[in-house]
From Swiss-Prot:
Keyword Disulfide bond: yes
Annotated compartments: Cell membrane
Extracellular compartment residues: 1-61, 124-139, 201-236, 313-334
Null allele phenotype: Defective octopamine signaling characterized by reduced octopamine inhibition of the aversive response initiated by ASH sensory neurons when exposed to 100% 1-octanol. RNAi-mediated knockdown results in an inability to distinguish between different food odors.
Keyword Membrane among record annotations: yes
Recorded topology in the membrane: Multi-pass membrane protein
Protein name per the record: Neuropeptide receptor 18
């Protein structure tokens, strides 16, 4: 098949001329096309033309510029979080077993990958057609939907991890690295199964916009373009949309609300118990520093759920609207084309998931106390003048949820609750009744555990070691 590239003019049926320049215009004879063999047009020459680009559309260029800013903001931000996590793990060996940092790291990787399709989206917006092949189309759809599904699954796992850290602090196996990676592997497998129809059917599809036949010159001029489409078919599209809505939006949203709500309820109860325990032992200013910042945690948690809800709800409403049109389009006698305002509005709606992926690193990374305070903890654990500070039983366990046991940093493994209790029994005889009470309670439901009252033999100065400024690190 021979082809050439030149400037051409495309004649619209009403006589209006549309200039086709800077684009390829291919030509081939009908003798080389199986579609017209044995027909009247068998010896006609077929000329292909591409439509004009949208570079002169100022509104669309503004949208493309906004997408470009999202791409730079999201990729740079998530890459910066990955660099910070790598630095923190290098400075503090204990953080290598930190499940919170693991979730933040995986979330940043997924959000970074979900930003990669944005340049292809911008090119498609400006040109008005898909300029890449089918393989690029499949890769584009895969990265786009991974950010929409797998990223949401990670946020749910993150909420479960924080819930377990607060409400079930003694369940160590639930929050170790092996369990986290098994959980992430299962979620990734479920994501791949959900996206299998996209991988099978997504391709670059040719769309013929207009065709004109010149009988005198025996030429057929066809204006066409390519679009990256899922092409699932009506039945499969309905099934795919419904189970994606339920599994990737509705259930994750309900899970996040439930686990964060239960976590806040437990924090309010624990804060009241700790406040009653510390009454009269310290001055008002010092006592305020030792309380749990429940209000700050509640605002932060509400911001997480609200931001996720705001970004994803309009998108899924638009998806359900397209599903409604797919199911009931046969009952419509006439279908008017969408207005420009509606098109621009839909561009904004579909930009919201990208905004969510580009901004997750702020809520889950920059606002996380473990990333903020990790360099400080490295130098403050040794203290001034060689004084060692105590830390919680595990990297992520808040001291007040570890029954207020003070554990020296160099005594035992920081991730071993059993060794911590043994150490307190052997070396701190004054706290023996407290340790025995905790040992007797380990077989009970951790949801019923509350801080035990301090005995009269316990030095009040140790409160600063039991409740440090890092007490909210697992939450924030």
């Amino acid at each position: 098949m021979s082809s050439f590239y030149n400037e051409a003019k495309f004649l619209i049926s009403d006589g209006e001329q549309m200039r086709i320049d800077t684009y390829a215009v291919g030509r081939k004879t009908m003798q080389q096309s199986d579609a017209f063999k044995g027909t009247f047009y068998e010896n006609f020459t077929l000329v292909y033309a591409l439509p004009l680009s949208n570079h002169d559309n100022s509104s669309l260029m503004l949208i493309a510029g906004f997408y470009a800013l999202l791409f730079m903001f999201g990729t740079c931000g998530n890459a910066a979080i990955l660099a910070v996590v790598h630095h923190v793990k290098g400075q503090d060996p204990r953080s290598r077993h930190n499940t919170t940092l693991t979730y933040i790291c995986i979330l940043s990787i997924v959000d970074f990958l979900s930003m990669l399709p944005i340049p292809m989206t911008i090119i498609d917006q400006i040109l008005g057609f898909w300029m890449f092949d089918t393989f690029a189309c499949k890769l584009f759809r895969l990265l786009e939907h991974i950010g929409k599904i797998f990223s949401t699954f990670i946020l749910v796992a993150f909420s479960i991890d924080r819930y377990c850290a607060v409400c079930h602090p003694l369940q160590v196996r639930v929050r170790n690295q092996r369990t986290v990676f098994v959980f992430l592997g299962i979620m990734f497998f479920v994501t791949c199964v959900m996206l299998s129809p996209i991988l099978l059917y997504a391709h670059s599809k040719e769309l013929v916009m207009h065709e004109k036949v010149d009988l005198d010159q025996e030429v057929i001029t066809r204006m066409h373009l390519y679009k990256c489409v899922d092409d699932l078919g009506r039945e499969l599209f309905v099934v795919f949309t419904l189970y994606s809505f339920v599994l990737a939006y509705l259930m994750p949203l309900l899970f996040m609300i439930y686990f964060y709500y239960e976590m806040l309820i437990r924090l309010f109860k624990q804060a009241n118990v700790i406040k009653q325990t510390l009454v009269g032992r310290r001055s008002g200013g010092e006592e305020k520093k030792l309380t749990i910042p429940v209000g700050h945690i509640a605002i932060y948690t509400l911001a997480i759920c609200s931001f996720h809800f705001i970004c994803w709800t309009p998108y899924w409403i638009s998806i359900l609207y397209s599903l409604y049109e797919e199911l009931y389009q046969d009952t419509k006698s006439t279908a008017s084309p969408p207005t420009y305002a509606f098109i621009y509005f839909m561009y904004g709606v579909h930009a919201l998931p990208y905004i969510n992926s580009a901004s997750n690193f702020i809520l889950y990374g920059l606002l996380n106390r473990q990333l903020h305070n990790a360099p400080e903890r490295k130098y403050t654990r040794n203290g001034v003048g060689g004084r060692q500070m105590s830390h919680a039983l595990t990297t992520n366990t808040r001291p007040e949820y570890s029954e207020l046991i003070a554990i020296p940093s160099s005594s035992c493994r920081p991730d071993s609750r059993v060794s911590a209790m043994i150490h307190n029994n052997n070396n701190n005889t004054e706290s023996l009744p407290l340790a025995q009470n905790i040992s007797n309670m380990t077989n009970k439901d951790s949801a019923t555990i509350v801080p035990m009252p301090m005995s009269a033999n316990v030095d009040g100065n140790e409160i600063y070691n039991w409740i440090t400024p890092d007490t909210e690190s697992v939450i924030l």
